[in-house]
Every structure is written in C-alpha cells, then in structure tokens.
Amino acid sequence: MIKPSKIFRIFYPSLLWQMPKTGKKCIYLTFDDGPHPLITPKVLEILRKYNAKATFFCIGNNVNKYPETFELIKREGHSIGSHTFNHENGWKTKTDDYVKSFQASNELIHSDLFRPPHGKIKRSQLKKLKTLNLKNDFQLSTFNFQLKIVAWTVIAYDWDHALSPEDVYQNVIRNANDGAIVAFHDSIKAYNNMISALPRVLEYYSQKGFIFKSL
C-alpha cells in the first residue's frame, strides 16, 4: 500500500498525512530509522546538491550510538523527530511501554515531531502521547508544545528487497504531488534502493519546479 487508504486516514484523523498547499509546489521528504554513520551522511550529501531540506525520524538507540551523525543532521539545517527508542511496533507493544520508549528517545532528540514505526499505533497510545506536556516531561523550559504525530502521503518501499530502485522511483513519482509527505529510510536494509532512487526523485521534481522543505 504505497498510499494509505482513506479508511486508515479516517481511523486516525489526528495524524499528519499531508501538508497544506502554500502556493509553491513542495515535496516533504522524510527519512526513518537512522541515524547511521555510513548511510545518513550520504543522504545529506545528496540533499545538499539539490538545496533540499528534509525531516529525519530518528531511533533513540541510534542517536545514542551515533551522536556525531545526529548532530550532523541538525547542522545541515534539517528537521528531526522521534521514531521511538528501539523501533517498537505499536500494535505489539503495551501502551505504557510504548510511551516510555517515546520518552526515552525524546530525552535525546527533543522534538515535537513523532512518527510511529511501521505506521502502527494503537488509539490508546495515540491518546496518551497527545496528552503529554513535553515541557514538563523533557524540561524544555523555553516553550510548551503538543506532539505532532506524522504519517505519510507516499511510502517509497525502499526497504523491500523484492523491489528494484526503478520500482521505488516509480512508486514516488506516480503518487507524490504538491504537499506530499514522502517516506524513505536511511537504513542498511533500504540502502541500495534508496541511494539509487533518491537522486532521481530529487531531479524529477526539481525539473518540475518543486522545492523540498522539512516539516
């Protein structure tokens, strides 16, 4: 399912599925499962060539292991978000444990953006996350904010080894239009497909006058 079904959107209306149109044609690239010290810098290099900004949904344990790579993402001017601490599947995780995983990750990441791994989250988890006061929970004393839970408009399926880089490229360009949130992965599993498809996606939309912004 490259694009989420209408039923899924109806069931989770509070998730961010697509960005509103702003008058400038825009694609919102996102990358899940990093940071990775060998892969993420290559993604950043490609984005830099196209003056593209993106959003990286980072796993807390990876941030803990690779803090230099995490800091590099921020220095390059990209947005960051949490992707739990150990990539927990919400449908298979108790609500309290899921929330604790988010809290552990965001103690390192400090962001108001969160994407559920696999896109799987229980309504009880969603409700509890939405009620968190991040100022109190994470000592972000300068301001107070509510968590934004981000889904996607199009998922590239770059991690699927049954697909070729061409398949991944076509998945994106056939389905992503103005305001689309596109999900890639800066992970070992997705590397071969992602690293081949991403520059082509950037080139395709650049030629059509799109810009690439972070969330």
Predicted regions span which residues?
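Catalytic domains of cell-wall/extracellular-matrix polysaccharide-remodeling enzymes
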Residues: 64-65, 85-211, 215
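Active-site beta->alpha N-cap acidic-glycine motif
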Residues: 2-91, 97, 110-111, 211
